[in-house]
Amino acid sequence: MNWITNYVRPKINSILGRREIPENLWIKDPTSGEMVFHKDLEANQYVIPASGHHMHISAKNRLMHFFDDGVYTPIENPKVVTDPLKFRDAKRYIDRLKEYRAKLGVDDNILSARGTIEGLPIIATVQDFAFMGGSLGMASGEAIIEAFHTAIADKCPLVLFAASGGARMQEGTLSLMQMPRTTVAIEMMKEARLPYIVVLTNPTTGGVTASYAMLGDVHIAEPGAMIGFAGPRVIQQTIRETLPEGFQSSEYLLEHGMVDMVVSRLDMKATIAKILRLMMKFPAAPEPSHAFSKDSQTQISKTKAA
């Protein structure tokens, strides 16, 4: 059959002008196995309609759905030294960067922009997990700090969507330095009395969790997101005990008071706009009947009196 498959079929296809069908037209839900057409999934912000499972979404797509009418102005990220340690593991770090940049068309994993949500001016910063696992390095650290400086200069709130596996090992201590540096920028934001809201997406771990991802005024998590410092497998091997079901999930963290609410991506924009109106004392906007989906997964934590 090989000669038919490898020779005859391509010849017939070329004669008839038949085009090959792309492999990514249908996306499989990892939880239910449901197949969803890629255009439908993109229109639904990469949330599976039936199960509500949140797929990974690119930084550009997230900003497009988050800002009013999909309109925003990108904030230019500062330039940094590339591969200062001349790091090499299985391949050179500089080569890894070139591969990701060519594949995704971005310099690193942070995209920041100016725009409005329900008419409110805002700065939004998004980590793209597709670029080296959203790892925190010099470039991403500088980009986050630049976003805070821009928000302070514009006197507007900042919303950060965190998605990261932690510090970038290829940059060593220079990567770890970004943890205190971003913390200082957050303190400047607080001194300016401007809201800083963090949206924790799947996954948010490592040094990112240990720094700017857990220093917001309000912490919102997407459903089913894994949030923690070390991964559950590492913790279980260290303490040699079975972990509770759903350990480090956004719902588990909500139940134990580590996040303020769990909100569906489909309701994120309306929820954040409502919070900012309260924090900034903006007039309340008339709330349309469809502002929240019927099966909204918004949950607000209840703090017990000490």
Swiss-Prot record:
GO MF entries: acetyl-CoA carboxylase activity; ATP binding; carboxyl- or carbamoyltransferase activity
EC top class, as a word: transferase
Main location: cytoplasm
Region (Disordered): 287-306
Catalysed reactions, as listed in the record: N(6)-carboxybiotinyl-L-lysyl-[protein] + acetyl-CoA = N(6)-biotinyl-L-lysyl-[protein] + malonyl-CoA
Listed EC numbers: 2.1.3.15
Record's subcellular location: Cytoplasm
GO CC annotations on file: acetate CoA-transferase complex
One biological process term in Gene Ontology: malonyl-CoA biosynthetic process
Keywords recorded for this protein, A-Z: ATP-binding, Cytoplasm, Fatty acid biosynthesis, Fatty acid metabolism, Lipid biosynthesis, Lipid metabolism, Nucleotide-binding, Transferase
Boundaries of every CoA carboxyltransferase N-terminal domain copy: 25-294
Extent of Polar residues compositional bias: 294-306
Involved pathway(s): Lipid metabolism; malonyl-CoA biosynthesis; malonyl-CoA from acetyl-CoA: step 1/1
Pfam families named in the record: Carboxyl_trans
HAMAP family noted in UniProt: AcetylCoA_CT_beta (MF_01395)
Family: Belongs to the AccD/PCCB family.
NCBIfam families: accD
Protein purpose: Component of the acetyl coenzyme A carboxylase (ACC) complex. Biotin carboxylase (BC) catalyzes the carboxylation of biotin on its carrier protein (BCCP) and then the CO(2) group is transferred by the transcarboxylase to acetyl-CoA to form malonyl-CoA.
Subunit note: Acetyl-CoA carboxylase is a heterohexamer composed of biotin carboxyl carrier protein (AccB), biotin carboxylase (AccC) and two subunits each of ACCase subunit alpha (AccA) and ACCase subunit beta (AccD).
Name of the protein in its database record: Acetyl-coenzyme A carboxylase carboxyl transferase subunit beta
